[in-house]
Amino acid sequence: DSRKKMADYTRRLKFDQVLNCFCYTGGFTVAALHGGVGHVTSIDSSGPALEKAAANVALNGFDASRTTFMDADVNASLRQFGSQGRVFDAIVLDPPKFAPTITHAERAARAYKDINRLAFKLLAPGGVLFTYSCSGGISPDLFHKIVASAGSDAGVDGFITERLGGAPDHPMTLNFPEGEYLKGLVVMRK
C-alpha cells in the first residue's frame, strides 16, 4: 500500500526532510520514520487527529524530536513555507475528499491544482511528491492532468514513477467503476 511505498522510497532515496500534509493519524509520518527519514513535519487541521498521530509515533518507538505536528490549515502552511524558503525532500498530499461526485469536479480540480502547485514549489530537485485523491468525481486521467498542470504552473518538471490505487483491502467490483476513487501519483522532480 501507499505507506509501504513511502517507507521504501525513504530507504532508497535517503530523505532527510518530509512534509506530510493532511496527516490525519500519521500513517505516512510513521512510514517515513520507519524508512529512516531525519524529520517529518505533519500538518492537519484536527487537533484530535494530531494527538493520535503523535501517539502512533510513540507507539512505534520513535523519538518525538524527529517530528513536528502542526494544527494548521495546509494551504496557508504551504504558502508560509514558500515565503520562508523551506524545501523538503518528499511531500505527501493526501487531502480529504474534495469532489464526492462529478458535479463538484471543477471546484475540486482547482483545489487539487492549488495544493499541488504550492507543494511543487517546496520540493527539492530530485525530491518526490506523493499526491493522492480520494474523490470519486475526479478520474485518474483528470487527476494526472491536474498534477501536470500544477507542476507546469510552478515551473517544475518531473517524472511519474508510479501510479497508485487502492490497497488490496479496497477492491473494485467489475460493475462499479466509480469504486476506483482512490488514486495517487508518485512524481520525482527533475
Predicted feature locations:
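Mobile active-site "lid"/loop adjacent to the S-adenosyl-L-methionine
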Residues: 88-118
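Conserved SAM-binding motif I beta-strand of class I
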Residues: 39-44
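S-adenosyl-L-methionine
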Residues: 48-92
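Conserved class I S-adenosyl-L-methionine
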Residues: 14-24
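Helix-to-beta-strand junctions that scaffold the AdoMet/dcAdoMet cofactor pocket
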Residues: 123-125
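C-terminal catalytic and target-recognition region of SAM-dependent MTase-like enzymes
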Residues: 114, 128-190
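Conserved SAM-binding loop of SAM-dependent methyltransferases across substrates and taxa
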Residues: 25-38
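SAM-dependent Rossmann-like transferase core, predominantly class I methyltransferases
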Residues: 1-16
